């Protein structure tokens, strides 16, 4: 009899502990697995758009490959091997600076990803139905257009109506939801058409309400 009472008490203690732990477990499961911010407000979306601007630049890379550089005899201590590769139009294998092609490519697509995340979040909130969300949508579209404009000019032939089928770049119009997705590059003409579409949609929405 004593053993039965002990088992009953033990069972009740275990059940009570489980009931106490359930809310804590639910709270844990409610957290994002990687601590990302849930974009559930206009202010959070506006803050995200800071990341829709690339931290890296491209003019230095293009300048070293241009006719404006004509002297390589004197090498500065700050000279990077990749800069000579730009000058000689060689494949860039010694990329270490923020202006390296690999850095420009990845950083501008990261900026595009931030813009697309903002656009998706605006849709999930019911659309751009407030002045702040309208302005945020406009900024995201313009940022996306500009980043693609930089990429298509740095990595592709410049737009020429006589050669509309020149190979372009992937135009990212939505946030990625799967690992290592495959994209079509399309043509330079198609990229410019999408840039124009984003600009025409985004520009009328921009105002100073979020600045």
Q: For each predicted feature, which ranges?
A:
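Sec-dependent bacterial lipoprotein signal peptides
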Residues: 1-25
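Terminal processing/anchoring signals of secreted or surface-associated proteins
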Residues: 25-27, 115, 145, 195
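Membrane-proximal, proline-rich intrinsically disordered regions
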Residues: 25-69
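Short amphipathic alpha-helical interaction/hinge segments
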Residues: 29, 33, 152-159
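N-terminal, post-signal-peptide region of Sec/Tat-exported proteins
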Residues: 61-86
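Acidic helix-start/capping segments at beta-turn-to-alpha-helix junctions
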Residues: 70-72, 136, 142-143, 172
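Conserved, well-structured interaction surfaces
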Residues: 84-155, 186-189, 201-210
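Short coil/linker segments at helix-helix boundaries
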Residues: 154-197
């Amino acid at each position: 009899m004593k053993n039965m009472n002990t088992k009953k008490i033990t069972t009740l203690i275990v059940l009570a502990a489980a009931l106490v732990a359930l809310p804590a477990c639910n709270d844990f499961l409610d957290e994002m697995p990687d601590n990302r911010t849930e974009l559930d407000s206009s202010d959070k979306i506006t803050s995200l758009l800071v990341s829709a601007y690339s931290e890296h630049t491209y003019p230095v890379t293009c300048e070293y490959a241009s006719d404006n550089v004509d002297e390589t005899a004197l090498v500065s201590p700050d000279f990077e091997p990749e800069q000579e590769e730009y000058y000689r139009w060689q494949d860039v294998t010694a990329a270490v600076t923020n202006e390296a092609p690999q850095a420009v490519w990845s950083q501008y697509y990261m900026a595009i990803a931030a813009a697309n995340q903002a656009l998706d979040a605006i849709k999930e909130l019911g659309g751009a139905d407030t002045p702040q969300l309208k302005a945020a949508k406009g900024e995201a579209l313009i940022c996306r257009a500009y980043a693609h404009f930089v990429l298509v000019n740095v990595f592709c032939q410049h737009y020429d109506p006589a050669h509309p089928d020149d190979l372009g770049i992937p135009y990212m119009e939505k946030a990625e939801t799967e690992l290592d997705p495959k994209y079509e590059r399309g043509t330079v003409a198609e990229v410019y058409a999408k840039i124009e579409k984003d600009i025409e949609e985004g520009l009328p929405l921009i105002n100073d309400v979020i600045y």
